[in-house]
């Protein structure tokens, strides 16, 4: 067993001043039976806690650290930017530079606006869609998490699912009634809802690759149905690529599946590990945003120079490496192949999902296509697996509903060590029914 004595003490102290001792619920290691390691530093593919334990990290700050932690070029760029000031609250040429870079990678984003979090991005995109269409209702998919905005915390995934509360207290009935929900990957249910309510729906928002009920890719024809029906009813189609952006492929899920949404939300990677996100899309929709239009959205720290600098440098580093996304996809495939072999040897039913460099596993005998399937996986086996991996210095997300991430910094040796650890962890999972 690893020693988490200092982390446990730090956790108890944190609980005095923060709800649950954390600033985001899943970090509290709910239901895992151990305190969360309190992190001190991270470099490359490794992360170290205050007890001195060093782990191979597959959380990657929940997605942003695609190059690995503390990448020298990114750190240097941030340091240079900080010497000029940490914030201006005024326009900079860097904001235009990152917008041009993002448009180059995502041509469907003709105009965009920087914000500080994925939640801000999705909230703002929905407001823009409502302003553009003059409609009130939105449609989302069960188990897809789009941040903690009121209208989006209805049958949500991620931490809400981890705590068994896909709906949140504090969301008014009036807000909830304008949010329609259908199962992810259920084409007939979606088509039926659009037939009944399509002309009232301002936007359909979806994670094109669901990453908050673990990793669940779209079934064949699902995204095509979304595009077809939204065009038919004049509804704005929003791809929430905060998580899967730059990971399913460098050009995102919309390139992988050849579906072009009206709007896109991005985050995580575009801040290079600092707080940054963006929403954007078709010119005529984005022209509704103030000061050009009547849809208001603003932010003191939007376009913060440190976050924008980190994002620009991260994207440039990725673009400079030939076949960057293919390299990460192969690393991920190699890891999952080893995990599946370990599960087979231990006699543990395991479903492995991957989309580029985001991935996840389900302790399940049947494939997982939606939130109901994800909830049916064996949570007790996941806990046994997770704790065994943690004790072998493999840092994974402490919830079966969270996706894992590969980085460019992960070496062949890292992957080999992780597969070796999986052999023992699957044996532990096999002891649990």
Language-model-detected regions and their locations in the chain:
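Conserved N-terminal phosphate-binding loop of PLP-dependent enzymes in the Aspartate aminotransferase
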Residues: 1-433
């Amino acid at each position: 067993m690893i020693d988490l004595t200092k982390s446990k003490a730090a956790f108890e102290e944190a609980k005095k001043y923060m709800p649950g001792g954390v600033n985001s619920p899943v970090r509290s290691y709910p239901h895992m039976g151990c305190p969360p390691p309190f992190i001190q530093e991270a470099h490359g593919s490794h992360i170290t806690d205050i007890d001195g334990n060093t782990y191979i990290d597959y959380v990657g700050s929940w997605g942003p650290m695609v190059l690995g932690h503390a990448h020298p070029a990114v750190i240097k760029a941030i340091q240079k930017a900080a010497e000029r000031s940490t914030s201006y609250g005024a326009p900079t040429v860097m904001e235009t530079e990152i917008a041009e870079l993002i448009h180059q990678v995502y041509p469907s984003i003709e105009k965009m606006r920087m914000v500080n979090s994925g939640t801000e991005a999705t909230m703002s995109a929905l407001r823009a869609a409502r302003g553009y269409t003059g409609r009130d209702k939105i449609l989302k998919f069960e188990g897809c998490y789009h941040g903690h905005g009121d209208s989006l915390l209805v049958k949500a995934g991620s931490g809400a699912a981890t705590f068994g509360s896909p709906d949140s207290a504090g969301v008014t009935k009036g807000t909830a009634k304008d949010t329609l929900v259908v199962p992810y990957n259920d084409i007939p249910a979606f088509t039926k809802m659009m037939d009944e309510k399509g002309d009232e729906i301002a936007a359909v928002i979806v994670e094109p690759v669901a990453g908050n009920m673990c990793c669940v890719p779209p079934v064949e024809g699902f995204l095509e149905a979304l595009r077809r029906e939204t065009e038919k009813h004049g509804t704005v189609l929003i791809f929430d690529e905060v998580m899967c952006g730059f990971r399913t492929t460098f050009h995102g899920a919309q390139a992988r599946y050849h579906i072009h949404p009206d709007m896109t939300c991005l985050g995580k990677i575009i801040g290079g590990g600092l707080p940054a996100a963006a929403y954007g899309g078709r010119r005529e929709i984005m022209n509704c945003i103030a000061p050009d239009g009547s849809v208001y959205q603003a932010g003191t720290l939007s376009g913060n120079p440190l976050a924008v600098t980190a994002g620009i440098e991260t994207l440039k580093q990725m673009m400079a490496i030939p076949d960057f996304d293919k390299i990460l996809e192969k690393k991920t495939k190699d890891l999952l192949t080893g995990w599946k072999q370990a599960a087979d040897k231990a006699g543990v039913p395991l479903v492995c999902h991957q989309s580029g460099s985001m991935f996840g596993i389900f302790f399940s005998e049947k494939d997982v296509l939606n939130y109901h399937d994800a909830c049916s996986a064996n949570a007790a086996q996941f806990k046994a697996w997770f704790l065994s991996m943690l004790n072998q210095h493999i840092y994974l997300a402490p919830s079966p509903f969270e996706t894992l991430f590969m980085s460019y910094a992960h070496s062949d040796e890292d992957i080999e060590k992780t597969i070796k650890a999986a052999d023992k962890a699957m044996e532990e999972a096999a002891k649990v029914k």
